[in-house]
Swiss-Prot record:
Stated name of the protein: Ribonuclease 3
Cofactor: Mg(2+)
Catalytic reactions on record: Endonucleolytic cleavage to 5'-phosphomonoester
Source species taxonomy: Bacteria, Pseudomonadati, Campylobacterota, Epsilonproteobacteria, Campylobacterales
HAMAP family the UniProt entry points to: RNase_III
Family according to the record: Belongs to the ribonuclease III family.
Any one of the GO CC terms: cytoplasm
Domain RNase III: 4-127
Sequence ranges assigned to domain DRBM in this UniProt record: 154-223
Keyword Magnesium in annotation: yes
Primary gene name: rnc
Organism this protein belongs to: Campylobacter concisus (strain 13826)
Active site: D44, E116
Subunit structure, as described in the record: Homodimer.
Function, as annotated: Digests double-stranded RNA. Involved in the processing of primary rRNA transcript to yield the immediate precursors to the large and small rRNAs (23S and 16S). Processes some mRNAs, and tRNAs when they are encoded in the rRNA operon. Processes pre-crRNA and tracrRNA of type II CRISPR loci if present in the organism.
Stored InterPro entries: dsRBD_dom, RNase_III, RNase_III_dom, RNase_III_sf
Amino acid sequence: MKNLEEFERNLGYKFKKSELLEEALTHKSTKQALNNERLEFLGDAVMDLLVAEYLFKKFSKIAEGDMSKLRAALVNEKSFANMARRLKMGEFLRLSQAEENNGGREKDSILSDAFEAVMGAIYLEAGLLKVREISISLLELCYPQIDFAHLEKDYKTALQEVTQATLGVIPTYELIGSFGPDHKKEFEIALLLNGKEISRAVGSSKKQAQQLAAKIALEKIKK
């Protein structure tokens, strides 16, 4: 593992207790007595609060349901993995040899967990203000266009992030049928959650119909 002082420079924060940072970067695969799972648990809660606060202040006219969708689009594995990559966190992780050989340093799940753990460690040592300063700066670097229209464009992704976060399920899409001449064919798609139909839409392609069905489902969920 590389020198942690280099990581601290990337992070913009010097730990008083280096063992806390070591714990945050230690994956459970190492079988060490201390790994980053507990710090990840704490960091997850801290990031959920800070992103919610950030959105609340940034979007003063957006309703609660829409803020929940924005938060789900930012507080998730992919988003946190991107922020971890900005810090080159993968280079500093402590992994088992098996996980190392399996490409663990670039896995979204491992990077995301480590990012949350590091934020949890900073919270323990320096408090909420310091975590806010570091995490929101990173968030804006990775997502310079944090606005409702930009993040909601891909309704399928936004819906999946919301349903995973709130229900623990992933939407499925079922082709009901197609109709019309070949040069102007339309497709009807049903969207299901846990096997129950939530919405249905028609589009000029399967992809468009899926996006429309996801948009309808998002509107229903936020009510």
